[in-house]
Amino acid sequence: FSGTGSRDDVGIKALDEHTLQVELIQPTAYFLNLVSFFTYMPCREDMASTGEGWERDPAKCITNGAFYLEEYKIGSHVLLKKNENFWNKDNVKLAGIKGLFITDATTSLQGYEAGEINVTSTLPGEEIPRLLAEDPNFVSEPALGTTYIEFNMDAEIVNDVNVRKALSLAIDRKLICDQVLRNGAVPAAAFVAPAFKLSTGESMRTMDEYGNVTTEFEINPNSAEVDKAREYLAAAGYPNGEGLPTITYLYNEGTGHQQIGEALQQMWGQLGATVTLESQEWATFLNTRKAGDYSIARNGWVADYNDPICFLDMWVTNSGNNDVQFGKGAAADAKIYSIDLTPYGYDTKVENGTWAETYDV
């Protein structure tokens, strides 16, 4: 990446016209997931250089995958056909795939129930329990993702760790999943989703005998800890919420986001907090978060491949997704972090360093 290496240092070589060899430094369970991500797919340079829109033109979008582009109708659908030149074509059972551009959850549900849609990621959350109970062909698969609330680390009020702990512990995650979302979501006790798997097939999170996420970082995923939350709020100087400034929760327009905000408003109200809800259009919302012009906001993240680094690298100082402002602004020079990776075979050990000197490593 720095441009100081040599070709001999790179463990990648083409053995012949159809075989690529990659030498890994260590066993990497997610490697095949990684190279199947679209950024690693080979691209015909002569086609990609023909101008904007080549990837939507069947005559120019050349692929080497299981399917090729037959038709692209903007705002309607994309039609893929089986590639008879694919190396593993005998194990490709579908003659083609038609992908519909549908953003409305109700329209997607109607298409599914009419037999016009087989797979979708867009359904009204309140309909999923009914479909699971009544439709033997309906299958819901977990995503490598987490919906979460993010605190602006530079913002007044929530830059106090005790305030953040109080607000977090007051949330009844199970109630939000079961009564607000009702879409099969499970309570989270930590940022990295339980759908991440080890090479053994087991979850990377600690699970109980029933497959539920267990308590981590003081967070009980199955109920709120209101009494403990009140203790942290008092430690921050706001006993029973007295003197606590008004909190604004920012979210984007969309299915369920306002309902989650209203649930949080009620839960934080138990601590004596006054909470206002603010909704923004999607593009404006993204810009507001990125600029750090908020205190508390909703967010969600879905990983690109099966490894926690897909989540954890969001918080490095210069990440484009570091909306919580770790190591930015007034906190950039704060030498308050420590890290010790020597027990894991690394040389890194920092005491009282900046965020960049610790987490970024």
PLM region spans:
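Extracytoplasmic/peripheral linker and loop segments enriched in polar/acidic and small residues
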Residues: 1-8, 12-13, 215-222, 274-285, ...
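A local structural motif
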Residues: 22, 89-100, 241-248, 266-280
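Append "and occasionally in soluble cytosolic enzymes with long acidic Gly/Pro-rich linkers
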Residues: 82, 159-266, 270, 335, ...
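Short helices/loops that flank or line small-molecule/ion binding pockets
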Residues: 106-116, 130-133, 161-162, 262-271, ...
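Extracellular/periplasmic solute-recognition and catalytic clefts
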Residues: 70-81, 98-155, 174, 178-180, ...
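Short helix-loop capping/hinge motifs at secondary-structure junctions, enriched
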Residues: 86-89, 155-163
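Gly/Pro-rich hinge or "lid" segments in bacterial periplasmic/extracellular proteins
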Residues: 2-9, 13-19, 24-96, 106, ...
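Ligand-binding "clamshell"
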Residues: 128-140, 292-293, 307-325
